[in-house]
């Protein structure tokens, strides 16, 4: 069961990867329409303003079509075959599902307690998806319907029909079966979802009123579950789903950013839900403090080597919010340090929230575009509060990690036993053995890693499923006994390996999509 949840979590990350760029576009266009930044260029009748508005509308695509994008994105990670056709089947099925709901509620809305004559939005519980007026099931409905369609696709796509029915094979058969299945799904949704919406409204009120403790607990769970890959199920419903605000924190913040920027009311009063989007601060301030502690405690003769490892990892965490390359340098050798990290991250978020900081998350690039620049005029105090608390926690992380590393003689980078270091330095020999020594360009590098990982997993015949998230290659194998030791993966360039029975996660880094593609190409070639 855990393996299936991990696969789903990884698959959910494909749509999430679209948000950073879209968020930056929206934020920058809002800034460029603000007269405080561009003066007379912000005249609504001017050509500049109109051109910026055109660009802004394009930036809203991802946010306005969120359920549709999640529905289509899920097959990328969960379909076992013919991924493009699975995406097509999901698109058709999800639209069919919403058309069914629209028709049912048009005729029998009052029977389900739904006034379908209302305008969409607000407290109506209604929305439009690809122009279809329907119940607002948010990303929950999209994920469920996409999951059902993917199951049908995996089970029936290769089904052989009699020759005279050959035209109905493949995607056509999948869509036909899904079409029939969507009728009861739509009926059940009309029957159950309005009641769930009432429950969600109560949950939203409860979470918002949970205050500082709620923020602490949310942030702790989001961090502590990273090694399992299940952290997506913590932040997903808050950031992209209806846990605390109907449209999700990410969309709600972007939609109201201009109003927040022009208001002098405290941000915590304007958007208290933003407390559940502070987990990114540990990626900036916490990771910097941890990196400094690891550098300080490294052997003098190893500091130069360690700095080459830690600087890029810390910068990646601080700038774009990808923390695995740093966190996995100490997670496997000292798991208790990761627990400490999660506690400190949660405490930092709670302290920031208590002092009025909200929705300052992810990495510096996103924070600069979505917080610092647009809010500087009326909310500069919040920015300085965030920075002050963050700097304090850099010091706290540094002191705590330095103390624990030295007290318990944790073998972090630069402190390994000599014989362990010798093993690590066999990387060049190991790569030469596998024919990687001649590789010079990035494409060859990805292929080299993929080849090494495939051999470490025991070859093509031992691979059951392949998936990935932002930084991890997720592999299910038939026989875990055929999988090589962690050092074999690290020698090929991995930051670490998570093992859970037949389910493995290889920490690759931001190049994981390219490595996965090369991995799958090698499997097909073999």
Curated annotation (Swiss-Prot):
GO terms for biological process: phosphoenolpyruvate-dependent sugar phosphotransferase system. Coiled coil: none annotated. Pfam families: PTS_EIIB, PTS_EIIC. InterPro entries: Glu_permease_IIB (IPR036878), PTrfase_EIIB_Cys (IPR018113), PTS_EIIC (IPR003352), PTS_EIIC_1 (IPR013013), PTS_Glucose_EIICBA (IPR050429), PTS_IIB_1 (IPR001996), PTS_IIBC_a_glc (IPR010975). The chain crosses the membrane at residues 12-32, 59-79, 88-108, 132-152, 173-193, 200-220, 224-244, 274-294, 305-325, 330-350, 355-375, 381-401. Residues 447-526 form the PTS EIIB type-1 domain. It is found in: Cell membrane. Residues 1-417 form the PTS EIIC type-1 domain. One of its GO terms (molecular function) is protein-N(PI)-phosphohistidine-sugar phosphotransferase activity. Its EC number is 2.7.1.-. The active site is at residue 469. GO terms for cellular component: plasma membrane. SUPFAM superfamilies: Glucose permease domain IIB. Keywords: Cell membrane, Kinase, Membrane, Phosphotransferase system, Sugar transport, Transferase, Transmembrane, Transmembrane helix, Transport. CDD domains: PTS_IIB_glc (cd00212). Gene3D superfamilies: Glucose permease domain IIB. The EIIC domain forms the PTS system translocation channel and contains the specific substrate-binding site. The phosphoenolpyruvate-dependent sugar phosphotransferase system (sugar PTS), a major carbohydrate active -transport system, catalyzes the phosphorylation of incoming sugar substrates concomitantly with their translocation across the cell membrane. This system is involved in alpha-glucoside transport. PANTHER family: CYTOCHROME C-TYPE SYNTHESIS PROTEIN AND PTS TRANSMEMBRANE COMPONENT (PTHR30009), PHOSPHOTRANSFERASE IIC COMPONENT GLVC (PTHR30009:SF12). This is PTS system alpha-glucoside-specific EIICB component. It comes from Fusobacterium mortiferum.
């Amino acid at each position: 069961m855990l393996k299936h949840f991990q696969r789903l979590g990884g698959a959910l990350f494909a749509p999430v990867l679209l948000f950073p760029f879209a968020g930056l576009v929206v934020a920058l266009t809002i800034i460029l329409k603000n007269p405080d930044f561009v003066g007379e260029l912000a005249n609504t009748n001017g050509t500049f303003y109109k051109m910026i508005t055109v660009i802004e509308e394009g930036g809203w695509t991802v946010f306005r079509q969120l359920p549709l994008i999640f529905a289509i994105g899920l097959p990328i990670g969960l379909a076992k075959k013919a991924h493009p056709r699975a995406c097509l089947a999901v698109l058709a099925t999800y639209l069919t599902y919403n058309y069914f709901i629209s028709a049912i509620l048009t005729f029998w809305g009052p029977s389900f307690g739904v006034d379908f004559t209302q305008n969409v939005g607000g407290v109506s519980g209604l929305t439009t998806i690809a122009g279809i007026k329907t119940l607002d099931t948010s990303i929950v409905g999209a994920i469920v319907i996409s999951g059902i369609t993917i199951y049908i696709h995996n089970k029936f796509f290769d089904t052989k029909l009699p020759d005279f029915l050959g035209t109905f094979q493949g995607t056509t058969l999948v869509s036909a079966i899904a079409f029939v299945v969507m009728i009861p799904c739509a009926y059940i949704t009309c029957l159950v979802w309005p009641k769930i919406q009432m429950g969600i409204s109560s949950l939203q009120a409860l979470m918002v009123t949970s205050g500082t403790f709620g923020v602490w607990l949310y942030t702790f769970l989001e961090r502590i579950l990273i090694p399992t890959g299940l952290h997506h199920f913590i932040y997903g419903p808050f950031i992209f789903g209806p846990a605390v605000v109907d449209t999700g924190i990410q969309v709600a913040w972007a939609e109201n950013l201009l109003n927040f920027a022009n208001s002098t009311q405290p941000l915590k009063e304007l958007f208290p839900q933003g407390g559940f989007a502070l987990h990114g601060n540990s990626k900036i301030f916490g990771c910097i403090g941890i990196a400094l502690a690891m550098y300080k405690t490294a052997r003098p003769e190893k500091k130069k080597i360690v700095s080459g490892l830690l600087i890029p990892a810390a910068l990646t965490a601080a700038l774009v919010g990808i923390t695995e390359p740093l966190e996995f340098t100490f997670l496997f050798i000292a798991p208790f340090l990761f627990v400490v990290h999660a506690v400190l991250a949660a405490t930092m978020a709670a302290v920031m929230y208590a002092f009025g900081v909200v929705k300052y998350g992810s990495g510096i690039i996103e924070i600069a575009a979505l917080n610092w620049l647009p809010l500087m005029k009326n909310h500069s105090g919040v920015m300085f509060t965030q920075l002050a608390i963050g700097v304090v926690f850099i010091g706290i992380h540094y002191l705590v990690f330095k103390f624990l590393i030295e007290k318990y003689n944790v073998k972090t980078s630069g402190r390994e036993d000599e014989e362990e270091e010798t093993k690590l330095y066999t990387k060049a020999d190991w790569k030469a053995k596998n024919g990687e020594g001649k590789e010079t360009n990035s494409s060859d590098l990805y292929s080299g890693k993929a080849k090494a990982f495939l051999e470490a997993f025991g070859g093509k015949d031992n691979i059951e499923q392949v998936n990935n998230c932002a930084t991890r290659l997720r592999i299910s194998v038939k026989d875990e006994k055929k999988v090589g030791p962690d050092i074999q993966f690290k020698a090929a360039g991995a930051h670490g390996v998570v093992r859970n029975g037949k389910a493995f996660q290889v920490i690759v880094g931001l190049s994981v999509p390219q490595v996965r593609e090369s991995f799958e190409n090698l499997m097909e070639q073999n």
